[in-house]
Amino acid sequence: MMNNMGDLMKKAQQMQEQMQKAQEEIAKAEVTGESGAGLVKVTMNGRHDVRKVDIDPSLLSEDKEILEDLLAAAVNDAVRRVEANQKDKMSGMMSGMGMPPGFKMPF
């Protein structure tokens, strides 16, 4: 019984270390959201910090409202990509630990 408890504690510690490593990788990962067929691009890291905004020069002569809409759409696209990347990383890690798909960790 004591040996099983020791194994369980060791496994829990390994899971926590793997989770921390995955969270660090997710935070560093960068994705680029786009709108207007790539005329506006927003690069964001896994913590949702916007790292770069790229606006095609042809849009600078357009109506301000159009540019604002395209920028908002690009940011929203980047947020969705960050969330998809997080989900992929975590589900890959969970399946590697033998956890069922969709299992939510308590931390």
Swiss-Prot record:
It is found in: Cytoplasm, Nucleoid. Residues 11-21, 91-107 have a biased composition (Low complexity). InterPro entries: YbaB-like_sf (IPR036894), YbaB/EbfC (IPR004401). Keywords: Cytoplasm, DNA-binding. Binds to DNA and alters its conformation. May be involved in regulation of gene expression, nucleoid organization and DNA protection. Signal peptide: none annotated. GO terms for molecular function: DNA binding. GO terms for cellular component: bacterial nucleoid; cytosol. SUPFAM superfamilies: YbaB-like (SSF82607). Residues 1-26, 86-107 are annotated as: Disordered. The keyword Cytoplasm applies. Belongs to the YbaB/EbfC family. Its main location: cytoplasm. This is Nucleoid-associated protein Maqu_1612.
